[in-house]
Regions:
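Ser/Thr/Asn(+Pro)-rich, low-complexity disordered segments
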Residues: 52-548
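Bacterial N-terminal signal peptides
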Residues: 7-24
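Positively charged n-region of N-terminal signal peptides that target proteins for export
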Residues: 1-5
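Ser/Thr-rich, Pro/Gly/Ala-heavy low-complexity intrinsically disordered linkers and tails
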Residues: 23-58
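Generic alpha-helix initiation/capping and coil-helix boundary signal
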Residues: 7-10, 43, 313
Length: 548
């Protein structure tokens, strides 16, 4: 899960009339070299009023004829920039980890705490590093094996085959210090995506261990059932499981009272893997994927998009695209599974429209935040000064004629769904990862971030990956130059020069999507590896998605 813990659930999940008052809807041919437009298309600052009325089953969200799909061609200058950015991300995963396990930390400042999601991104980053020549295949394979053996060999790090959100980076077991102690379905899903990618790339013993872990995942154990959940919340994958006591982390406990019920990226990724499970008794019915609610909204007239009101952060459109090649799967078909009142959606196009909305609203910048602009956009979850923030923006909601409240779309007071610009902090990974959808705008944003300077002329956000001189596990965070590329987030000063802030830390689940999204935009390597795997092929077939 993108927020650091379930405690930040309010920023990402549905808050309807569910259990305990919470009903969780929780929880990559325009040439890239072209300069992106400088004026936003029409759109709303705050979607307080409905944009119009539609019958959901009549809506098809698909790619316009002639629009370029990834992978793209980039200029030599752009490729040089992308090499640098990816190399910096890889340095985090290679150098910041614990030498005993190989596992990258959740954040560089806490080397003993790893997130299983971060490890999933880490495993997927290693094939990129081999193909780019930063490490040898043998080195990457050995590190991958070390990580997988560590995780497979510790029986206290998982329940029902899914992993605890946070683990001890030195042992792969229960951490003495963690932000939460829960078995997390989304963080496990992100790990399994990395394991599947590694299995396809390395084969051999890596595949044997990785495939075994994937097969052990019993998604059916985590499905919401019974009176503990509202009727419209039942038979979805829950966010996870919490033990009764940490003394017995695999003993008794209970499912969390939150479910993946909306069609954000995290919801779909969890449910896809649950459908694709290679062990028949562990799998869920494919119709669950199509029952995920698809609330509709609009930023540009005539271009509907699926959205949900619990988070307008850009990351909710990014994660699944790091592995699933939605661009070439075409619009899905809920009606084929007898699920009514659902739009047919090409999820790549849906993410592109959402990306466009984020940039449009940053250019208009009605909140007057000094950081936001033509080349600084993509409000998303990240560190902020004094904590962690999940800002975001929303389309105008469309009235879904004939649809059932709560069952087909989340119920909320649309007058209170307003764009949340937070304190104006921007995380470079957000616009950078959107290179999968809007390559020209993403390149321009990364070049902007790369060129920002301090008053003394030194780089504001950039730490050159070529300058890395530390040993494995010595991150030199205090020195401020660890060689990990972009800082996690920043906020520019207000007029008068006060308020400048740059995040001092580096976060695995921000570095991860950036390196993978760029690679998919350049070569499609990660989506190709993912779709080569038998488990993924089975999931695509079961869901009757288009050919890869």
């Amino acid at each position: 899960m993108k927020p650091l813990s379930i405690a930040i659930l309010l920023g990402v999940c549905s808050l309807g009339a569910g259990v305990g008052g919470f009903s969780a809807g929780c929880q990559s041919e325009a040439a890239p070299e072209q300069t992106p437009r400088s004026e936003p298309r029409s759109g709303a600052d705050q979607p307080a009023k409905a944009a119009g009325e539609v019958v959901a089953s009549d809506v098809v969200i698909d790619v316009a004829m002639g629009r370029a799909l990834p992978p793209y061609s980039f200029s030599a200058e752009d490729n040089a920039l992308l090499d640098e950015v990816q190399h910096g991300c890889f340095n985090f995963f290679w150098y910041a980890g614990d030498p005993k396990t190989g596992m990258a930390p959740d954040r560089a400042s806490e080397p003993r705490v790893s997130s299983i999601a971060g490890v999933g991104f880490q495993l997927s980053a290693f094939p990129v590093a081999v193909e780019r020549g930063w490490v040898t295949r043998a080195e990457a394979e050995a590190r991958t094996l070390l990580i997988l053996k560590t995780l497979a060999g510790n029986s206290e790090n998982r329940k029902g085959g899914l992993f605890y959100h946070f683990l001890d980076g030195a042992t792969g077991g229960q951490p003495s210090k963690a932000y939460e102690h829960v078995v997390s379905t989304i963080d496990s899903a992100l790990f399994f995506c990395g394991a599947i990618t590694a299995s396809s790339y390395f084969g051999g013993e890596v595949a044997r261990i990785a495939d075994g872990l994937v097969a052990d995942a019993d998604w059916s154990f985590f499905v919401s059932k019974g009176d503990s959940y509202q009727p419209y919340e039942r038979n979805f994958v829950t966010l996870g499981w919490k033990p009764t006591s940490l003394v017995a982390p695999t003993g008794s406990g209970k499912l969390l009272p939150y479910v993946w019920v909306d069609a954000g990226d995290e919801h779909r990724l969890v449910t896809f893997l649950a459908v694709a499970a290679p062990t028949a008794s562990h799998a869920v019915d494919p119709s669950m994927y199509y029952r995920l609610r698809r609330g509709l909204g609009e930023n540009v007239p005539g271009e509907p998009m699926v959205w949900f009101p619990w988070s307008g952060a850009l990351f909710v459109q990014l994660f699944a695209h790091c592995w699933l090649d939605y661009a070439h799967l075409g619009p899905d078909n809920p009606a084929a599974f007898e699920v009514a009142q659902r739009a047919r959606v090409n999820w790549w196009e849906n993410a592109r429209r959402t990306t466009q909305m984020h940039r449009d609203k940053a250019i208009k910048n009605p909140a007057g935040k000094p950081t936001l602009g033509e080349h600084a956009w993509g409000l998303s979850a990240s560190d902020i000064e004094g904590g962690y923030g999940v800002p975001g923006v929303f389309p105008r909601p469309l009235v879904m004629k004939g649809s059932r409240p709560e069952w087909d779309y989340p119920v909320t007071n649309t007058d209170k769904i307003v764009d949340n610009y937070g304190d104006g902090t921007i995380a470079p990974y957000a616009a950078g990862s959107a290179i999968m959808f809007e390559p020209a705008a993403a390149i321009a944003a990364m070049r902007h971030y790369r060129g920002l300077k301090k008053a003394d002329g030194d780089a504001l956000l950039w730490s050159d990956p070529k300058m890395i001189s530390m040993g494995w596990g010595k991150t030199q965070i205090g020195a401020g130059r660890p060689g990990f590329g972009f800082a996690d987030a920043y906020r520019e000063a207000e007029k008068g020069g006060t308020g400048l802030w740059v995040a001092p830390d580096y976060v695995a689940i921000d570095q991860g999507p950036l390196i993978l999204a760029i690679e998919n935009a350049r070569t499609g390597l990660i989506t190709k590896l993912f779709h080569q795997h038998p488990v993924v092929k089975a999931g695509v077939k079961r869901l009757k998605l288009g050919p890869k």
